[in-house]
Each structure stands twice: as C-alpha cells, then as structure tokens.
A protein has these predicted regions:
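N-terminal glycine/serine-rich phosphate-binding loop of ATP-dependent small-molecule kinases
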Residues: 1-86, 132, 139-162, 175-180, ...
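C-terminal, non-catalytic interaction/recognition modules in large multi-subunit enzymes and RNPs
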Residues: 4, 12, 144-157, 265, ...
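Conserved phosphate-binding loops in N-terminal lobes of ATP-dependent enzymes
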Residues: 9, 16-20, 30-31, 35-44, ...
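Glycine-rich phosphate-binding loop of actin/hexokinase-like ATP-binding domains
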Residues: 19, 31-39, 86-92, 112-113, ...
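Short beta-strand-loop/turn "lid" adjacent to the catalytic site in phosphate-handling enzymes
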Residues: 30-33, 58-103, 166-175, 198-212, ...
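Conserved short loop/turn motifs at secondary-structure junctions
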Residues: 64-65, 162-171, 213-216, 426-431, ...
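Glycine-rich beta-strand-to-loop/alpha-helix junction loops that act as flexible
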Residues: 70, 165-166, 194-196, 245-246, ...
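Terminal amphipathic helices with adjacent charged low-complexity linkers/tails
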Residues: 162-210, 214, 393, 565-567, ...
Length: 693
C-alpha cells in the first residue's frame, strides 16, 4: 500500500483552478489557485502542482495520489464540444431524443425552447429488434440491418456511438451483441451501451444519458491521458483518482468509462468540504453556498448528511427553469444553481433592470479588472470598485487588479444607461446578485419542506465569503461559518472523499409477492462488482462497505422515492420492513403516506465505499502568519464608502474576535464582514460569524 505522505486535490473551475496539498503526517495544508486554461485544462493543473511542489519542498515521489474534479464534462455538453456521435436504437424509436416526455417546462409558452439533441437525425438510426417489458425477446436482433447501420454511421462521420434499445435495462442481450457488431465493423469507435451506463426504466432519460456519455467520453479520455502524462513527467507515480458527482472517488480507468458521472464533480467536493467544516464548528444543518467564478450553487445538509438524487439536468436553455435541459440519470449530490459567479457579466435590459449572467467572462478574457482584454462589467469588477476586494492583495498579491478598467466598464455599461455613479452601479450589481441568490436558496429550502433560517451557512468558492453576509442577512440567518481556505474548499473536499461507486439496476415489480431470491441475486451481483472495483483502487476487501437503496413508489405514480434498505431485511425477505422504510422516506418528503395503496419497486442501488479519509482541521495552522492589521481600505457600507480595517486571515488565532465592518483577507478569498456582525475564530480556524438581528 502506498504510504507517501502528501496528497493533492485539484478542482478545475470555469475561471480558476484550485489546488490543495495536504501532509498526512501533521495535517499541514497548502493552497493554490491559478487561472484556468480552457484550451488545455491540464496546463493549469500542471502549473499549480509545480508551484505546490516548489512551495512545500516535497519530492514528487512523496505524493501518494492526486484526486481531481473538473467541469470539463459539463462544459463539453454545454458548449457542444464533444465528438460527432451516433445513436442506434430500436426501429421506430430513433426520434426519442426530440420527442422527450409529455412534460413541458413552460406550459403556456407556445414557442417554448428545448435543447437541441446532441445527435442530429441523420446520425440516429433504428435497427429491428424488440424486447418485452420483462426482458423476454419478442423479435431477434436483425444483424444484417445492424451492420448496415454501423456502416451508415461511419459514413456520416460518427466517432462515438450510443446504443439504447427498448427495455435493454431488463435484458442486455441485444445491446451486447450490437457492441460485438460495432467492434467488428468499426473498431475505432467509442461505444456506450444504455444497459451499462444507466440500466433503469425511462427510455428518454436512459437514451439522453447514454448519448451524453458517448459524446464526451473520447474528449475526456484524451484529457486524462494528457494529464496523466504530465503528472508522470513531474515524477508523480501515485494513482490519479477522479471525484464523482455523488461525493465518491474512483480510479482513473473507471472515470474514463463513465465520464457522465463527473458532470457535477467540482461542486460535489464543495459539499463534502462544507459538511466537514460545519461538523468542526458543531453545526449539523448547513446551507452550502458555493460561489465561484462562473456560477453559484446551493445545497442543504441535514443532520450532517447531504441529500442525493438520481436526476440531473445539464445545458438548460432556460438557466433556472427545471426541465429545460438535457436530462441525466446519474447519482448526484442534490444541489441547485442559484445565481451568477464572479466572472458573470452584468448588463441593463430593455426594461432598465440590471441583469447578471448567465454569460461569463471566464478566465479569458476575464473581468475587466484582470487587464486581459475584458471590457464588460462583471461581479468581480463590482466587488473591486466597492472595496471588497483589494487591487494589490488579490491572490496574495500574485495578480494585480485594474481598478480604473473596472470603473470604466461599470460606468459605460451600467452607470451611463441608468444615470448612476460608478459606485452606485457597482452596488446595483452586487445587490442584484445577492437578492437573486437569496430568493433562489429560500425557494429551494421551501421545496424541501425546510426553513432556510434554521440553517448555518458555510460559504465557499472564491466569491462566496464576499457575498455571504449580505445574502445571509436577506435570508434571516444568524450564523455563518467561514472556513480557512474557503476559496479552494472543493479541492479540499476531494481529499476527504472515500473511494466509492454506485451501481444501479432497474427492476419494476410489486412489493407484494416480491421475488426476494431475485433481489438477493441483483444486489449481490452489484456488491461483488463494487468490491472488485474498490479493490482495484487499493481498498482492502475487509475495509469496503455496501449500502443498499431501493427506489419505490405507490402503484400508479410516475415518480419514486429512494430509501435505504437494511441488507438483513432482504436476506430474510421482510417486505413489511421495505414498506416501512419507503413510507418513512415518503412521509419526510410529502408529510403524508397512503397506507391503503400497494407499493411498487422501481430500481435498486448498491453503493460500495472504502473508508473515509480522516482530515483533522485543528492541525491546519501551526503558527500565525504575518501581522493581523494590514491597514484600511474604503469599502461600501450603508450607501457610502467607509474606511474599513483590512485584516490578515492567517494571523487570527482561536478565541480572537473581530467586529464589523472589516475585510478579512486570505490568498484565495476575502470575508466581507458588515457593520453589526461579529466573527470569532474557533479551534478549527473557522470564522464563526454572528449576523445582526
């Protein structure tokens, strides 16, 4: 077993790439942040790793492993930068990607926009074959027609092929044979089968997910090869692990086969981190607020556990409207996008209202204040002009910000159209962003039958602590926990995530009279697969654990509720226990149950995980770094500039308190502490903020 002391976490965002290097011997943590290189994302990773090795003095062979999360998969889908992909499906069903379901995300809009399918119609082909809902063969696969379809797709320029036959999740026999034919006729094509990517009921969602996986897989595989080669070039011989969207990590080889499982990998690391930070501060109910350079996301953690979901959307045509994107059936941590990021561009609409996002300046050209060619105002430009960010101290002074360029962009695009001064224009952007995010977070909590003011906020991301207190006051929160290293929290979260993978198998059957022998076979097979995968990633067999979850519903419903099922209840065939677990989960979501209705099982999931790495936050800071007071800076509070103390975050020690207004800076982020708020440094070096009533 590799016992090298250093571990590295890397998160590629739309604007910055964040890195954390942890010494497992004494808990020392070193953070890094570099501009993302969109044309070749691995270049930013390698630059950041090179810098960390130099700063720590660590040898490359002293690095145990690198754990990596990235927006590459999501961005490839949003920006349509995958490879030309084909779809082979059951004859008569090739238009499923356009037909979708009967659900409309805007019922009354006759001109409602929907996402364009990733596969155009001329590369969607049907092949004669048919399985019945129970998986039995009604019509054998037409192999001659299958070969013709493969040749047609090659002629049409396809580089990857998704195969999605009707009811294949119940019996993969035809999809497996289709793969053999594809390998014979076109061995250079990437092949993805729906029975392997998402073996669940729901033809449209299954097809969409499989197509998305095929569309990005060649791009992602090439990226992983370049990154692995670059790391080995440094002498890093330890394995590369990838963060999944549900909070687990997997070996590089597994991630290469299932890139769609990484669609939310970066934000998932952030949620993992906030749970650790909150627990260190004694908080169990947490609002994770993650505001980076491109977007802001929120997630609720109840009693120390983040909720998971099997439904997600990407590439929405209407950013905040559910149902307007490409549906994915993948395990994800339940979170929502609630607003813009630091690089989001502000504008005035035709009604004279300030709008922010979704368009982002990203890292190239970036906000106007970066001096890299950006000329349109962003949230970061507004925060700089308001005095919340320091022009000379951004990224620890490694990157100087151009205040004049930010003022010019704000005045031209916001101030002039609205008749506002430059500071007023900056405040309009700041308030618009904060108001939108507060409203979205409150609605998200209400949809979960929760009160948002019952949570403590943990803000992370480079822009999170800048906006946290103002958003918290709008939400009526009393407590905000700001961790040390909040600006690189997602990368830190990767280091605390276990080796884990979720296996799913659809099997629709009534609970009454359920064939428990078949269920034991299904869950046993998935458990064995998971333990083999964990062992390949270095987890000892005795250290791997398995959880079983069942997705169930009342007969006749079109949605299901997931509940954790004790393995012993399956062993002894206890249908009453399964129903009790389902109804407890249903009651928690909807406040009622229907005892008279029969229950139907829809799918089963086994999550196999290794032990969770232990990260002791109390070891983060061995000694204070630098002096506490850095002087003052004019910052905007109460409608005017106020000379505000600027403090060094790394010089604050446990037990010390700061009264607002104050600007508390560290290399990767700044906490804006408004008048009336108090921040106390706790034993884990969190800043525990109490907001004014």
């Amino acid at each position: 077993m590799n016992t090298a002391p250093w571990r590295i976490g890397v998160d590629i965002g739309g604007t910055f790439t964040d890195l954390v290097m942890l010494d497992s011997r004494d808990g020392r943590i070193f953070n890094g942040k570099v501009l993302t290189t969109p044309h070749a994302p691995e270049e930013a990773v390698l630059e950041g790793v090179r810098d960390l090795l130099a700063r720590t003095g660590a040898r490359a062979d002293a690095v145990r492993h690198v754990i990596h999360g990235t927006t590459l998969v999501a961005n490839a889908l949003i920006e349509r930068r995958g490879v030309p992909t084909g779809l082979i499906t059951t004859k008569g069903f090739r238009d499923i990607l356009e037909m979708g379901t009967e659900l409309r995300h805007d019922t009354y809009d006759l001109f409602m926009r929907v996402p364009e399918p990733l596969v155009p119609r001329h590369r969607r082909l049907g092949v004669a074959e048919r399985l019945l809902p129970d998986g039995s063969v009604r019509e054998a696969l037409d192999e001659a027609g299958a070969r013709e379809a493969v040749r047609a797709l090659r002629a049409a320029g396809a580089k990857a092929v998704a195969v999605c036959f009707l009811h294949a999740f119940r019996n993969p026999i035809h999809e497996a044979r289709m793969r053999e034919i594809l390998s014979e006729e076109a061995p250079d094509l990437t092949i993805c089968l729906s029975s392997e990517v998402v073996p669940e009921i729901g033809e449209y969602e299954r097809a969409s997910t499989t197509v998305c996986n095929a569309y990005v897989q060649p791009v992602f595989e090439r990226y992983l090869r370049r990154l692995s080669d670059g790391l080995r070039g440094f002498g890093l011989t330890g394995p590369l692990f990838l963060m999944l969207s549900d909070g687990g990590t997997v070996a590089e080889e597994t991630a290469a086969r299932h890139p769609i499982r990484l669609v939310q990998s970066g934000p998932a690391g952030g949620v993992e981190a906030t749970g650790i930070y909150g627990a260190a501060a004694g908080a169990r109910d947490i609002l994770c607020f993650d505001m980076g350079g491109t977007t802001a996301k929120a997630a609720l953690i109840d009693n120390g556990e983040a909720k998971r979901s099997l439904d997600f959307e990407v590439a929405r045509v209407d950013r905040f409207r559910k149902g307007s994107g490409l549906p994915l059936k993948v395990p994800v941590i339940d979170m929502i996008e609630i607003g813009a990021g630091g690089g989001s561009i502000a504008r005035v609409d035709r009604l004279g209202l300030v709008r922010v996002g979704p368009e982002s300046a990203s890292s190239d050209p970036g906000p106007a204040c970066y001096g890299l060619g950006g000329a349109r105002p962003t949230v970061t430009d507004a925060d700089l002009v308001l005095g919340y960010l320091g022009a000379e101290s951004f990224l620890g002074g490694a990157m100087k910000l151009d205040v004049a360029a930010a003022e010019a962009a704000l005045g031209e695009h916001i101030g002039k159209p609205l008749g506002l001064s430059v500071p007023e224009a900056a405040w309009a952007i700041h308030e618009t962003v904060n108001g939108n995010m507060a409203q979205a977070a409150a609605i998200h909590a209400l949809e979960k039958a929760k009160r948002i003011d019952a949570y403590a906020m943990v803000p992370i991301g480079g822009a999170g602590p800048v906006h946290a207190c103002h958003i918290g006051m709008k939400l009526g929160l009393r407590r905000i926990i700001v961790p040390l290293g909040a600006g690189v929290a997602s990368a830190f979260g990767f280091l605390a995530a276990p080796i884990s993978f979720a296996f799913i198998q659809g099997w629709v059957a009534p609970l009454a009279g359920l064939d428990f022998a078949k269920l034991r076979e299904i869950t046993g097979t998935m458990t064995a697969q998971g333990k083999a995968m964990a062992a390949a990633a270095g987890v000892a067999p005795e250290a791997a654990s398995a959880r079983i979850l069942g997705a169930m519903r009342y007969a006749g419903q079109g949605f299901q509720v997931e509940a954790e099922i004790p393995a012993e209840s399956i062993t002894r065939g206890d249908a009453a226990m399964l129903r009790a677990k389902f109804e407890a989960a249903y009651l928690a979501l909807y406040g009622r149950t229907e005892p008279s209705l029969p229950v139907e099982c829809v799918s089963w999931q086994v999550i196999v995980a290794g032990p969770r790495p232990v990260v002791d936050l109390t070891q983060q800071g061995a000694a204070a770094e630098g002096t506490l007071h850095r002087g003052t800076r004019r910052a905007w509070f109460g409608g005017a500039y106020t000379e505000t103390p600027v403090l060094n975050r790394l010089a604050l020690r446990p037990g010390e308190s700061v009264q607002g207004p104050a600007l508390i800076e560290e290399r990767e982020c700044t906490l804006v502490l408004p008048p009336g708020a108090t921040a106390r440094c706790d034993a884990a070096l969190n800043l525990d903020v109490t907001l004014p009533a």
